[in-house]
Amino acid sequence: MRVLIDTSAWSVALRRQTTAPRPPVAAQIEAIIRDGRAVIIGPIRQELLSGIRDPHQFEALRNHLRAFPDQSIAQADYELAAEVSNLCRRKGIQGSGVDLLICAVAIRAELAILTTNQDFQRYATVV
């Protein structure tokens, strides 16, 4: 199964490691990449690149991310994200627009989501 890697997982994996052991999510991402199952969507790409201040690091990350195929985002994904948002709110669950768009794209395209963001566990109780 192809895997949509969320910004939170990428951020942990891309963080410079000094003395601490490498986080498990980094090994998961490496395995997903090795297997050719990693996909990305524009909003995740934007979030990752928006956090880079140094122009050289920005360019390096942009070039690395270009290796991963973009999963298209359809009009129906935005509509489903809005539906999921409304369902979540009715259950007292708040979600960001990007998170719920990730859920919608994953549902339509039958993608797994790799994330360290615990909010996705709450979304899963609704969708």
PLM region spans:
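Short, well-structured N-terminal submotif of metal-dependent ribonuclease cores
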Residues: 1-40, 50-63
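A generic structural signal for short hydrophobic patches within well-formed alpha-helices
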Residues: 10-11, 45-48, 120-121
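A general structural signal for well-ordered alpha-helical segments in protein cores
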Residues: 26, 41, 45, 58-61, ...
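Active-site neighborhoods of divalent-metal-dependent phosphate/nucleic-acid chemistry enzymes
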Residues: 68-116
